[in-house]
Regions:
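Active-site beta-to-alpha loop of glycosyltransferases that engages the nucleotide-sugar donor
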Residues: 131, 138-153, 173-174
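Short, acidic, metal-binding catalytic loop of nucleotide-sugar glycosyltransferases
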Residues: 129, 151-166, 189, 263-264
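Long helical/loop segments within the catalytic core of UDP-sugar-dependent glycosyltransferases
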Residues: 117, 190-195, 209-229, 234, ...
Length: 299
């Protein structure tokens, strides 16, 4: 029987409460222990302080190394022509014959050749690239067109064909008339750009819901499911991406995800996490927020 992994409602068990408290207790205990040891024995306090500083230094070096390493990987991946690689998957036999002896050192090129070889041998098990669609769902509350517009523009300017992108603007009714007007204006502005531009208004106070982005996108997802059924689109070949209203998608992101989706045999049970860089409006944010944003980008 499948175990329920949801957060329990109501009273927790003693073990559950203990495990909830443990991370915070360890964090606060580590700080309190420094003062306690200093009162008991200054030498022990000094040794403990040195251990804390040394461990922090080691972690800082590790983060710095991984950050530089990750940056290099990102840059290598950005230099790849993902649109061309996706197009290669349409004709795996020809592409494999053309590339198998190529001494290309680009990001995951050898894996690309292996994928072509595998698809050439078992083509029916893989979807054709022209049968793959992206549903891009953007959650909004009360943001204006100056925030939402550039985010939609970034989706429009990706290398993935716009006629295979279904854009969904999921906005909150509690956002008022302003967001409803913004949504309608954006739909008119981007009419004909994507395969379709859907507006989904999330009602207030639905039973069993909490206020937040999750219920908004869940409600929109149900509307998209009905849309896909009405349009007879291949639901097994649809990739769903959720965005905040200020997220700017990288130009090659959709092609990169489509490539991974097509070439993976267990594609229906995959989820994709992009590298999030919190800096598209960093100069408009207060200094403390900038520090937090840069730190979050490191991780």
């Amino acid at each position: 029987m499948r175990k329920n992994l949801e957060i329990p409602q109501g009273k927790r068990t003693k073990l559950y409460r203990f495990l909830e408290i443990l991370p915070g207790a360890i964090s606060y205990g580590a700080i309190i222990l420094l003062f306690v040891l200093s009162l008991i024995d200054p030498v022990l306090g000094a040794i403990y302080l040195f251990i804390l500083i040394a461990s922090t230094l080691v972690k800082a070096i590790g983060v710095a190394y991984r950050t530089v390493q990750g940056y290099e990987v990102i840059k290598r991946a950005e230099r790849v022509d993902w649109r061309k690689r996706v197009e290669d998957l349409s004709h795996p036999h020809e592409a494999y014959e053309r590339l198998r002896d190529d001494n290309n050192k680009s990001y995951h090129f050898e894996q690309h050749v292996e994928n072509l070889k595998m698809m050439a041998a078992m083509g029916k098990e893989y979807p054709s690239p022209d049968k793959v669609y992206h549903v891009v769902m953007m959650a909004a509350y009360n943001e204006g067109p100056e925030i939402i517009g550039p985010s939609i523009e970034a989706v429009k300017n990706t290398t993935f064909p716009n006629d295979h992108i279904i854009f969904v603007l999921a906005y909150e009714r509690r956002g008022g008339e302003a967001i409803a007007t913004t949504a309608e204006n954006l739909k008119k502005q981007y009419k004909g750009v994507f395969r379709d531009f859907l507006l989904v208004q999330h009602p207030d106070n639905l039973p069993g819901e909490v206020v937040g982005k999750g219920p908004n996108l869940t409600y929109a997802g149900k509307a998209v499911s009905r849309y896909v059924a009405e349009k007879h689109l291949p639901v097994e070949n649809i990739i769903v991406t959720s965005l905040d209203s200020d997220n700017h998608m990288a130009p090659k992101y959709l092609d990169s995800v489509a490539y991974e989706f097509i070439t993976h045999p267990n594609r229906q049970r995959l989820s994709y996490q992009p590298v999030s860089l919190f800096m598209n409006n960093i100069w408009d944010a207060p200094a403390p927020t900038r520090v937090i944003a840069v730190s979050n980008s490191f991780f």
